[in-house]
Amino acid sequence: SNTDNPGDYYLVNLNQGTVKLLFQRSPWLDRDKLAKAIPVKYMSRDGMEIPALLTLTKKKTDKNYFIVMPHGGPNTKQYIGYDSWAQFFVSRGVNVLQPDFRGSTGNGTAHYVAGNMQWGKTMQADISDGVLWAIENGYADEDRVCIAGASYGGYATMAGLVFTPELYRCGINAIGVTDMQQLLNDYSKKASILSSWDKEPLLEWGDMSTEKGRAYAEETSPLLYVDNIVAPLLVLQGSNDPIVEAYHAEDLISELKAKGKTYEAMFQQYEEHCVTYCGEKATLEYLEIQEDFINKYLKN
């Protein structure tokens, strides 16, 4: 597999020196229409180098439509491999940037620990700087930029919309954290039940038992800053999600309604923590509503 190929399976006979194609993953996809991701790097505002994958649409479009897609985790990385969600957007005429903002893995210790207690802060600035880099280099039109992500990427979507509303024309928050205070409280309760606490979340997210941790959670909870949102928002949520529980989306929608914001939402009753590798019906419904959303708000 590769960034432009979901996977081919071969039988290799070393004795005969032959290679035989057995089958293709997702054979209905035209490989010629899939786009290869390009590894790029850009500098953040404080001088940190940020690796990213840039995937450019093969479609001819009247504008440079653009989506920045922060990955989940956040303590993971943007792997070089086939990404059906990115390819979906690219096939619709949208360029996609997937940055390894600070706090991502695979880029050295300094890059990783620089993300400690930086949700919504320098981690978000790295994403914003990726957007500015794309605009400067002609991959994005400044008035045609959307942000989309799942899990931590959903949090980053919300942080982008509330802390840098001027950057984005729309946003897609899939299974994303919106309430940092509640997230940290939930993990504290789970830890006390198990009589243990993983030190890594304390370092990364903060400690709600301290004044500093409580202040950090308040500063970085998108739910508290819904007033700042000016772009239309799509919220996708699995009702049975055990990782980012549905109250994150439900409380967000209540605030969006109360503040008169433009939004759409889809809850999948039987799904958990997923957006592209859910059940077939749910995955297709998620993709259909996203296509309608970007046609309505990114392209019009």
Where are these regions (language model features)?
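Structural motif
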Residues: 4-11
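Short loop/turn segments that connect beta-strands within beta-propeller blades
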Residues: 14-17
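Active-site-proximal cap/loop segments of hydrolase catalytic domains
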Residues: 101-300
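Cap/lid segment of the alpha/beta-hydrolase catalytic domain
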Residues: 25-146, 150-151, 178, 185
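Short loop/turn positions at the edges of beta-strands in beta-sheet-rich folds
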Residues: 3, 44-46, 164-165
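Hydrophobic beta-strand positions
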Residues: 11-12, 42
